[in-house]
Regions:
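Subset of outer-membrane beta-barrel
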Residues: 1-281
Length: 281
């Protein structure tokens, strides 16, 4: 999702499209596996004035997996300044994660749960916040973000309490550039690095071929997940872009799933190209 909507991982991305940008996406992970994750996202973000220094945004996401349903609702604030040949955006986000796990929907071989605690519902609402930085020009971009700054632990009373633990942070580093071979042909390579002290380092290598600013054909390789991704986007109008991606597992999961599908739609109101427009990013 971050390839078409950087707001998903970096709050500083808010307003960098220099238009009111509406994004909608749906991701069905690991098709053919019962209870596999399905993820939906709706977001809006835009500069609030012509000087484009302050930007605001909203995002809601809905995740289902197994017997659990998660909802996230977040607001975004970003402030950008001119720096060198581009702009540096600094962003914050704040909101809530709501989760509901219905253990009564679990199915057991003998019809009864082995653990009496695996009955009823577990519901909780937890506030969270994130921070990010994003620098972009018309030729390249770079971003650094920590989408979730608050970490929680469950106590003996089954209540969640804030438990600061920097080792649980997930830090995202992104970078990319635009290589122009001709007016009708461009290449956009990029990379995403996800780091957490208790998880393997994740690296995504991405590349897009852009034809006449209308057709985007690309691919991605996720090293940690051992997954190859095919990407296809169509810029229907200067305002409307639709996309599709297919993830193919190269590891042991390939024996159980037919892949992951994702569709996305972006519409930008009053879109206008400027010298530092990040329309390719």
């Amino acid at each position: 999702q971050y390839l078409t909507n950087g707001l998903v991982i970096n709050p500083a991305y808010a307003g960098t499209r220099e238009a009111l940008s509406a994004n909608l996406s749906y991701r069905k992970q690991w098709a053919r596996i019962n209870g596999a994750p399905q993820f939906q996202t709706l977001s809006l973000h835009s500069p609030v004035n012509k000087k484009e220094k302050v930007s605001l945004g909203l995002m809601a996401d809905y995740l289902t997996y197994g017997v659990t349903k998660d909802v996230g609702i977040y607001a975004f604030y970003a402030y950008s300044v001119r720096l060198g040949h581009g702009r540096l955006s600094m962003g914050l986000k704040g909101g809530f994660d709501l989760s509901n796990t219905n253990y009564n929907r679990l199915q057991f071989p003998d019809g009864n749960p082995a653990d009496p605690l695996l009955t009823g519902d577990m519901k909780y609402t937890l506030p969270n916040m994130g921070v990010g930085f994003y620098y972009y020009t018309d030729k390249y971009f770079a971003g650094l973000s920590v989408p979730s700054l608050l970490t929680y632990k469950r106590d003996e009373a089954d209540q969640f309490r804030v438990s600061p633990d920097y080792s649980l942070f997930r830090t995202y580093l992104t970078a990319g550039t635009l290589i122009r071979f001709a007016d009708v042909f461009k290449v956009k390579p990029s990379v995403l690095v996800r780091y957490s002290m208790h998880e393997p380092l994740e690296v995504d290598l991405n590349a897009n071929l852009i034809f006449a600013d209308m057709l985007w054909v690309g691919g991605s390789y996720r090293i940690a997940e051992k997954a190859a991704v095919a990407l296809l986007d169509l810029q229907v109008t200067p305002q409307l872009k639709v996309g599709y991606s297919f993830d193919y597992q190269l590891g042991h999961l390939n024996n159980y799933t037919s892949g992951t599908h994702e569709v996305s739609l972006r519409y930008e109101f009053a879109f206008a190209v400027s010298a530092t427009s990040p329309r390719y990013f």
